[in-house]
């Protein structure tokens, strides 16, 4: 294994932020092309990294400077905006800033405001984004929106003269630096010579690499090793809570009946009704006590009036009449949709063609190659394998891969990595710490596994996903009585390894929560990367990719999102 490859995976970032205890402006690298527009020239901002994350705060600072603005400390004369995390409140912000009150003319605004400004390339209204003191008296003058002078209509994007005259204006954030012989490097381009510039290079051991793979990090001295509590500001975000602290379901007698209906709607293709039931079921499972009245049911977010009526019917009669009227098609549709490669629409088509059993499908239906394989191994695919069998499958792939290159990393993800006792399938992620040697391994590895008789059927022989390559197939361990199992092999570049590891570990519910949280912060999370300053249109559709943030480990992803780190076993939602 190339040790330099490992070192590059844990870069030492150069900080570009102001000392919060100083009135001096931040020292910012040489401006990049694009300042000329200067549409942020009237902005003098301090970015408070708490909750936002240091890397994202640095990115905001860089964007402000690039577009003509200035970055100040919170105490600097003339500061106009102090930008804080979405979950921050006014009083806590002042405590962290060590200020008795906001500086004259300054506004406390949420980071979403700055993200919106960067997306629209103009200073936008701060209405709905600004934080004010709950103790503010009614006769105290209110700051004008987005720093505009209310007496001067038509001056959108220009800060009021009165605000700027309260104190001496800030000096320019940077003075023109001497000409460099080479263009300045961006944060993601810092090389090993930059890392060693302070005389101390990062020391990354094999234990660090093992921690990255397993997701288990050593507990610092003095800590009890239990899961960190979720920050209060993150509320009920699933990704902020350890799954080990799932609430007791006090309404099991209700949710188990609603789940039957939800499943019926799902196999019938009524996805919106199925989604509505799923939300109500999750809300009832999380409720802190048994539901006892119609009013109480209606008060639970996610449970509407009609759902509350069904809850009361179950409470009063112990039954739900709607279950008596589930179509006879539902069990047949469920049977068909469990064939790998057949979704709800295909299952419905087969039902309407008059098929009622797997024998009908086997003898009469027109099947794709994938559906034929799914039907052939129907019972094996539905049977969950013991954890020990999944470990043997991972080992088989690892030994074969490392026969080509001993430095390759192979990690089983999914329910196996989350510590489940049984697994439905196995996802094996493959990479190499040097960032290069994973290339060219995909096809030779699959050929080797086929020659050994380990891979028995190919479902999708190669699926390209950016720089990632994915194989979906069927395997069987050597020996009598072994069953056919679903296996996915994904080869990824090391720069995407942490985000891919997070994505393929799951759970799906946990991943959806993390992606949704990232979206609220103007970011985007995928199996490839975590990006900041993402541009979305009014429908929330991403139209600008933003800037990829460095994420050498899963821990970095959590940190950049302002989340406490959750080990894989704590993500089993």
UniProtKB/Swiss-Prot annotation:
Residues given in the record as Mn(2+) binding sites:
425, 427, 488
Feature: compositional bias, Polar residues: 127-149
State the family named in the UniProt similarity comment for this chain: Belongs to the DNA polymerase type-X family.
**Subcellular location, in the record's words?**
Nucleus
**What binding partners and quaternary form does the record give?**
Interacts with PCNA. Interacts with PAXX; promoting POLL recruitment to double-strand breaks (DSBs) and stimulation of the end-filling activity of POLL. Interacts with XRCC4; promoting POLL recruitment to double-strand breaks (DSBs) and stimulation of the end-filling activity of POLL. Interacts with NHEJ1/XLF; promoting POLL recruitment to double-strand breaks (DSBs) and stimulation of the end-filling activity of POLL.
Q: Which GO terms describe its molecular function?
A: 5'-deoxyribose-5-phosphate lyase activity; DNA binding; DNA-directed DNA polymerase activity; metal ion binding
The record places domain BRCT at 35-131
> Can you supply a Gene Ontology BP term from the record?
double-strand break repair via homologous recombination
Matches recorded under InterPro entries: BRCT_dom, BRCT_dom_sf, DNA-dir_DNA_pol_X, DNA_pol-X_BS, DNA_pol_b-like_N, DNA_pol_B_palm_palm, DNA_pol_lambd_fingers_domain, DNA_pol_lamdba_lyase_dom_sf
Give the annotated active site: 310 (schiff-base intermediate with dna)
| CDD domains on file | BRCT_polymerase_lambda, NT_POLXc
- Disordered: annotated segments: 126-235
What is this protein called in UniProt?
DNA polymerase lambda
**Where is dCTP bound in this sequence?**
384, 415-418, 424-427, 511
E.C. numbers: 2.7.7.7, 4.2.99.-
Q: Which residue ranges does the record annotate as region DNA-binding?
A: 263-277, 343-346, 464-503
Q: What does this chain do?
A: DNA polymerase that functions in several pathways of DNA repair. Involved in base excision repair (BER) responsible for repair of lesions that give rise to abasic (AP) sites in DNA. Also contributes to DNA double-strand break repair by non-homologous end joining and homologous recombination. Has both template-dependent and template-independent (terminal transferase) DNA polymerase activities. Also has a 5'-deoxyribose-5-phosphate lyase (dRP lyase) activity.
Q: Which PANTHER family match?
A: DNA POLYMERASE LAMBDA, DNA POLYMERASE TYPE-X FAMILY MEMBER
Q: Which GO terms describe its cellular component?
A: nucleoplasm; nucleus; site of double-strand break
């Amino acid at each position: 294994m190339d040790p330099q490859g490992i070192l590059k995976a844990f870069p030492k970032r150069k900080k570009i932020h102001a000392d919060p205890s100083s009135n001096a402006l931040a020292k910012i690298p040489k401006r990049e092309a694009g300042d000329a527009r200067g549409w942020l020239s009237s902005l003098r901002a301090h970015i408070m990294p708490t909750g936002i994350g240091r890397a994202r705060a640095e990115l905001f600072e860089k964007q402000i400077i690039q577009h003509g603005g200035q970055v100040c400390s919170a105490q600097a004369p003339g500061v106009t905006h102090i930008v804080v995390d979405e979950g921050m409140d006014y009083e806590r912000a002042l405590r962290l800033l060590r200020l008795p009150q906001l500086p004259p003319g300054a506004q406390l605004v949420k980071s979403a405001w700055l993200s919106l400004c960067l997306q629209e390339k103009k200073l936008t209204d701060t209405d709905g984004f600004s934080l004010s003191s709950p103790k503010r008296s009614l006769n105290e003058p209110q700051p004008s929106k987005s720093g505009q002078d209310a007496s001067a209509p038509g001056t959108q994007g220009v800060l009021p003269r009165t605000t700027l005259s309260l104190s001496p204006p800030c000096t320019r954030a940077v003075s023109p630096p001497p000409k460099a012989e080479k263009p300045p490097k961006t944060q993601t381009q810092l090389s090993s010579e930059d890392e060693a510039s302070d005389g101390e290079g990062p020391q990354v051991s094999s234990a660090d690499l093992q921690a990255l793979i397993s997701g288990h990090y050593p507990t610092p001295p003095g800590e009890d090793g239990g899961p960190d509590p979720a920050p209060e500001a993150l509320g009920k975000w699933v990704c902020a809570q350890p799954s080990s602290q799932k609430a007791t379901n006090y309404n099991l007698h209700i949710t188990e009946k609603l789940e039957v209906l939800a499943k019926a709607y799902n196999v019938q293709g009524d996805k919106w009704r199925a989604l509505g039931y799923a939300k109500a079921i999750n809300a009832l499972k999380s409720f802190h006590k048994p539901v006892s009245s119609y009013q109480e049911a209606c008060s639970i977010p996610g449970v509407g009036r009609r759902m509350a009526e069904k809850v009361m019917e179950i409470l009063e009669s112990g039954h739900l009449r709607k279950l008596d009227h589930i179509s006879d098609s539902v069990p047949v549709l469920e049977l068909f949709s469990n064939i790998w490669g057949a979704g709800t629409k295909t299952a419905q088509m087969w039902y309407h063609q008059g098929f009622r059993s797997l024998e009908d499908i086997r003898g009469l239906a027109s099947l794709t190659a994938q559906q034929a394989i799914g039907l052939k191994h129907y019972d094996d695919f539905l049977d969950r394998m013991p954890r020990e069998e999944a470990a043997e499958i991972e080992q088989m792939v690892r030994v074969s891969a490392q026969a080509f290159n001993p430095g390759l990393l192979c990690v089983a993800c999914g329910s196996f990595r989350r510590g489940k006792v049984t697994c439905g399938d196995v996802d094996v992620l493959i990479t190499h710490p040097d960032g290069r040697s994973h290339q060219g391994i995909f096809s030779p590895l699959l050929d080797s596994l086929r020659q050994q008789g380990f891979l028995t059927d190919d479902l999708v022989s190669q699926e390209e996903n950016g720089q990632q390559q994915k194989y979906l197939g069927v395997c069987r361990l050597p020996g009598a009585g072994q069953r056919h199992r679903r296996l996915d092999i994904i080869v990824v570049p090391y720069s995407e390894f942490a985000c891919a590891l997070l994505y393929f570990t799951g759970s799906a519910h946990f991943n959806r929560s993390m992606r949704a949280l990232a979206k609220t912060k103007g970011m985007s999370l995928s199996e490839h990367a975590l990006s900041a300053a993402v541009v979305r249109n009014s429908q929330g559709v991403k139209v600008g990719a933003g800037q990829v943030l460095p994420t050498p480990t899963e821990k970095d992803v959590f940190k950049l999102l302002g989340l406490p780190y959750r080990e894989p076993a704590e993500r089993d939602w």
